[in-house]
Amino acid sequence: MSDTLLTLRDVHINFPARKNWLGKTTEHVHAINGIDLQIRRGETLGIVGESGCGKSTLAQLLMGMLQPSHGQYIRSGSQRIMQMVFQDPLSSLNPRLPVWRIITEPLWIAKRSSEQQRRALAEELAVQVGIRPEYLDRLPHAFSGGQRQRIAIARALSSQPDVIVLDEPTSALDISVQAQILNLLVTLQENHGLTYVLISHNVSVIRHMSDRVAVMYLGQIVELGDAQQVLTAPAHPYTRLLLDSLPAIDKPLEEEWALRKTDLPGNRTLPQGCFFYERCPLATHGCEVRQSLAIREDGRELRCWRAL
C-alpha cells in the first residue's frame, strides 16, 4: 500500500476577474501558481504563510471544492474519504439541527443509516471529543466556542475519513481553549490513524502539531521540509522573514533583513522572475528568472537558487 495519499503536480488555479462586453474573460486572479506536493499517510502537514498566499484556496482544492485550471490532483486508492474542520465553528454548524444530527449528517448523506444507529454513533464520538452525551439534543448556540469546535471535529470523524483538512481550527477560539483543541486533535490522530493538513498563519500552532511544513507565498510553495528544520533554521529568505516577524523581547530584526516592499504583490499580473524578488533583501542578479522547487542536500525543497 502506498504511503502517499494525495499528490499535486504543477497545479494552478485561476479565477476570472474581468470580462469584456462579449462575456469573454480578459483578466484572471492567479490564486495557485504551480504547486507540487505529496501528502503522506499518518503525517501532519502544516501549511503556513501570510494572508492572501493561497492557503484556503489550497484547502478547497484538496477537498474537491475547486478543480485545477492546470495540472493534476491525484488521490491514491479508489475511495479516499476526506473531511474538513472550518475556522469558525458557529458558522459551519446548522443552527436548526440538534447536535446529534449535526455530528452524524455525513453518515446520513452517505448511507441513510437509522436514527438509532446515528444516535449511538453520536454518543460515541461525543465522548471521544469531550462533549457530554446528555447535551446531544441541544442546538449549537447553547455551546461555547471550544465546544462547538469539538462538535465540528466529531462531525468530521463520523464518516471515518483518511484525511482531515484543518483550516485555521483554533483562530476563532480563546487562547485558553486553543491548546485543549490542539491536544485533542493529536490524540484523535493517534487513535484513528488520521492524516492532517493543518492550514494556519499561526507559526506556534504549526510548530506544535506538524511533522512537515510547507511555506506558501503568492500561490507557490517556497520551502518544504521537516518541521524542526524549517522552523528552527529557515533557508528561504521569505521563511526567515516570516519567522523573524514573530514578537520577541530580546531579538531585534536585523536591518539588512527588512523587506524592501511591505505590500504583497497583486495576483492578477504575476512577477516575471522570482515571485519574492521585489521584496527580498537578498535579491540580486539571477533572481529575475522564475525559480523552480529544487531539493537541497538536507532533503528540503526550496524555491531559491541562493539557498541551495
UniProtKB/Swiss-Prot annotation:
Keywords, in A-Z order: ATP-binding, Cell inner membrane, Cell membrane, Membrane, Nucleotide-binding, Peptide transport, Protein transport, Transport
PROSITE patterns (alphabetical): ABC_TRANSPORTER_1, ABC_TRANSPORTER_2
Subcellular location(s) of the protein: Cell inner membrane
Membrane topology reported for the UniProt record: Peripheral membrane protein
One record GO biological process: dipeptide transport
Membrane-spanning intervals of the chain: none
One of the record's GO molecular function terms: ATP binding
Main location per the UniProt record: membrane
GO cellular component: ATP-binding cassette (ABC) transporter complex, substrate-binding subunit-containing; membrane
Pfam families given in the database record: ABC_tran, oligo_HPY
Segments forming domain ABC transporter: 8-243
Entry superkingdom: Bacteria
Induction remarks: Induced by RpoS in stationary phase.
Binding sites annotated in the UniProt record for ATP: 49-56
Record-stated family: Belongs to the ABC transporter superfamily.
Function of the protein: Part of the ABC transporter complex DdpABCDF, which is probably involved in D,D-dipeptide transport. Probably responsible for energy coupling to the transport system.
NCBIfam families: oligo_HPY
Subunit structure: The complex is composed of two ATP-binding proteins (DdpD and DdpF), two transmembrane proteins (DdpB and DdpC) and a solute-binding protein (DdpA).
Name under which the protein is recorded: Probable D,D-dipeptide transport ATP-binding protein DdpF
Organism per entry: Escherichia coli (strain K12)
Organism lineage string: Bacteria, Pseudomonadati, Pseudomonadota, Gammaproteobacteria, Enterobacterales
Gene name of this polypeptide: ddpF
